[in-house]
A protein has these predicted regions:
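N-terminal helix-turn-helix DNA-binding module of bacterial transcription factors
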Residues: 1-72, 356-357
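Short beta->alpha connector loops
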Residues: 112-115, 136-141, 260
């Protein structure tokens, strides 16, 4: 029977171990371990000797061994539906900044708005023993699924449904769509198109409800042809806007997501020769670079993206922090933070063309 031995390339330095540190410091292995982990009594002289040796040898703890010993990994997972969405980039950055202040690393995953992909990634993160998860919207949102995941893992929902014992951070998308629709109604528009994700996702459902509420408040029936909702917001783009603008009874205003959908609507207005805001008014949901840099600048439904990320991280840190913080989090049960929206008026809205309200 042949045997296999693991060899190390002479160009690859051997990993410095705690035994090496103990030997260099002239102390026992147990003393070195207590000094490095601050886990027991160590004399000041021994502590300084161990610290000097660790620094001289560039010692770094083995994260796997450390995780097995402490039961924590120091890593948090974050899942979003579309990493290409610039709004997510700002949220992710805010989460990372807050976690790093407490010594946590973050691993980001992309679900591509797929329930199957989300479940695969959640399972992967759990097997990698992350300390907690932040989950953004996904294709099919089931509160019972989040309850199941959170039985043995700290979970924070971000703009998605969750059970009574769950925790989440949400933007008031109902109010955002309601105020956007009222803004256009006050200008005289009645044929207002809404382009968003559908009711399977919390943000889409709230926007549709807010839009309907504003129309009903004015005694206006909703033309269902003007409500374009899709399981994936990415499916809504140029072709949908082009179809709406080419219709005989076209909309005079749009409320649309301020990412790829906004780009599709702007492309459709150019192709059909409709000018913003002279022929078509436009409000985007979610503010960013494109709405501000486009000419004319696009009126937007805005909210504090950094606050979303920071709040999600804060809730998760309380849940996984251990000690008093963890006890308080469990005693309080589910926590919810709801953030408000505001209309940022710019140059993309005007009264409808004469005779086309």
């Amino acid at each position: 029977m042949s045997s296999r031995t693991r060899t190390t390339s002479p160009d690859t330095p051997a990993r410095v171990t705690i035994r090496d540190v103990a030997r260099a410091a002239g102390v026992s292995l147990g003393t070195a371990s207590r000094a490095l982990n601050r886990s027991g009594p160590v004399s000041e002289a021994a502590l300084q000797a161990v610290e000097r040796a660790a620094k001289a040898l560039a010692y770094a703890p083995d994260p796997i061994a450390q995780s097995m010993r402490t039961g924590t990994s120091g890593v948090v997972g974050l899942l979003v539906s579309d990493l290409a969405n610039p709004l997510y980039a700002r949220i992710i950055t805010a989460v990372e900044i807050r976690l790093q202040r407490e010594g946590y690393a973050m691993v980001v995953g992309n679900t591509h708005n797929s329930k199957a992909q989300e479940e695969l990634m959640v399972d992967l993160f759990r097997r990698r023993r992350v300390d907690g998860l932040i989950l953004g919207p996904c294709e099919v949102e089931r509160a019972d699924y989040l309850d199941q995941v959170s039985r043995d893992l700290a979970v924070v929902a971000m703009d998605r449904d969750f059970g009574a014992q769950g925790s989440g951070v949400h933007v008031d998308h109902f109010r955002g769509a309601y105020e956007a629709c009222r803004y256009l109604l006050d200008l005289g528009h009645t044929r207002i198109a809404l382009m968003t994700s559908d009711g399977a996702l919390r943000p889409g459902r709230e926007r549709i409800d807010g839009y309907r509420a504003a129309m009903a408040e004015r005694g206006l029936a909703v033309d269902e042809a003007l409500v374009r909702a899709s399981r994936s917001a990415m499916d809504l783009s140029f072709s949908d806007a082009l179809a709406l603008l080419s219709a005989k009874s076209r909309p005079t205003a749009f409320i649309c997501l301020g990412t790829r959908i906004l780009s599709g609507v702007l492309q459709a207005t150019r192709q059909t020769g409709h000018r913003v805001p002279h022929d078509v008014s436009l409000i985007c949901v979610g503010d960013g670079d494109l709405p501000q840099l486009y000419s004319p600048a696009i009126t937007a439904v805005s909210w504090d993206l950094e606050a979303v990320g920071t709040a999600a991280a804060e809730i998760l840190l309380r849940a996984i922090g251990g000690g008093e913080g963890r006890s308080q989090a469990k005693a309080q049960g589910g926590q919810e933070v709801r953030l408000t929206t505001q209309i940022v008026p710019r140059e993309s809205c005007a009264p409808p063309p004469a005779g086309m309200a």
